[in-house]
Amino acid sequence: FYTREGSVTVALSWIVMSIMGSIPFLLSGSITNPVDALFETVSGFTTTGASILPAVEPLQHGILFWRSFTHWIGGMGVLVFLLCLLPLTGSGYHMNLMKAESPGPSVTKLVPKVQSTAKILYGLYLFLTVMEFVLLLVGQMPVFDSLCTVFGTAGTGGFGIKNDSFGSYSTYLQGVVTVFMILFGINFNVYFLFYMKKPKDCLLYTSPS
């Protein structure tokens, strides 16, 4: 399983996931145009944050949740997410998928077992997600709002559930989200090295070109 095949698999998986992800928008009637639904989904999975919706508050809670959740999945990468769930065979298969998709560590230098590393990355990702969720609840943000906000923050795409985005929330909540926008924006290789008890390597590491 070569690098080129890994890249093709990643590209095809993105296309399939995006088409499947647009189905909830169409079935709910929230977006009736298939192209618009696909645009919204691709924007979510790629964490671009662009939207064709003029207002989001009229949307059903289930659709708002799904819209934000696409950011959370896309934040670490759809294929890395699948690697955590699917028992794929062949180290070369894992290696090239991870290399083509992951925003985390350089698999050729730091990662002996790619599927295990994918699980570690998502474990760290989930840990930060839970931390932000709890801090938002402490600030008396409603549970649903907190959950959707965390997904949008983790993916760094910024999908919100209010028409004014985050303008109606308190200074404390804005501060929490600001801090976690920075934390989620940091290269996950830094967290990975700390997890592996190699903090000094963080200063020596440079992202592969």
Residue ranges and their predicted role:
Residues 205-209:
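Conserved small/polar residues in nucleotide/adenosyl-binding loops
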Residues 16, 20, 24, 86, ...:
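Alpha-helical membrane-inserting segments
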Residues 81-114, 126, 143-147, 183-202:
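Juxtamembrane interface elements at the cytosolic ends of transmembrane helices
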Residues 66-88, 118:
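Non-catalytic accessory segments adjacent to catalytic cores
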